[in-house]
């Protein structure tokens, strides 16, 4: 069990860094234990309803609902809601690249993620689980993207910035997977946001905390529905609609401080896991086994 962490609300600068908002810039014109997972569910969920004595497929949950996966000891329970409110405790950043397994067989993973450690800024090189940095993206600012090789351009396009938000979520009139009303209290969550529009939307809310010298944990971000964005194939993807009401404020309780410490511990464990993967992959690349070495070992094993 982690020790109690004292949150001193009089020290904005120190806590802003701990909560991951000190590095936000404002422009004119963001292997560990299980945490409940929040996301936007883009596809409608179909169910069955009896109409005039016949079972008919109907849409029980619309696309664009917020989905919370509450992780249990053996399986997960899913909750959906059109409107939610989140009380953000902190945020972190990482880079992530999805690698599809095009030849996946039944029961095999369809792909895997290359991902970096989580940091309070993306303005530094981050170790990743492939033994490299930044999922292969070059260091520093790229002045001339077109001067890069086509392969490097393609790789960079595949790498996404991820804003990772930790906090407590309250779901308004939640329903289960069958669209049936259910009850749910305030639940701790992690939300990994990699869509660029959603990334900016939540970043704008965190930027307000900086301009007002407020801490995220003291306020609630209200996510009132989602915005549908049409795709060329006729389907849609959805992005959050967010607003922070600074007229309401929350005191920080002992339970909040414990949960804050739990989130910090989770991030440390996640980063330790990624760093372990990094060290192992670096070792594999620096100490490759040549064909001659393999033959020597085989010859040695064959000696009687």
Regions found by a protein language model. Give the residues of each.
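Extended serine/threonine-enriched, polar tracts that run as long, contiguous segments within proteins
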Residues: 160-247
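Long, highly charged low-complexity segments enriched in Glu/Asp and Lys/Arg with interspersed Ser/Thr
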Residues: 114-115, 119-125, 235-304
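Charge-rich, solvent-exposed alpha-helical interaction surfaces
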Residues: 15-18, 205, 209, 266
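OB-fold ssDNA-binding interfaces and closely related basic DNA-contact patches used
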Residues: 2-183, 231-237, 297-304
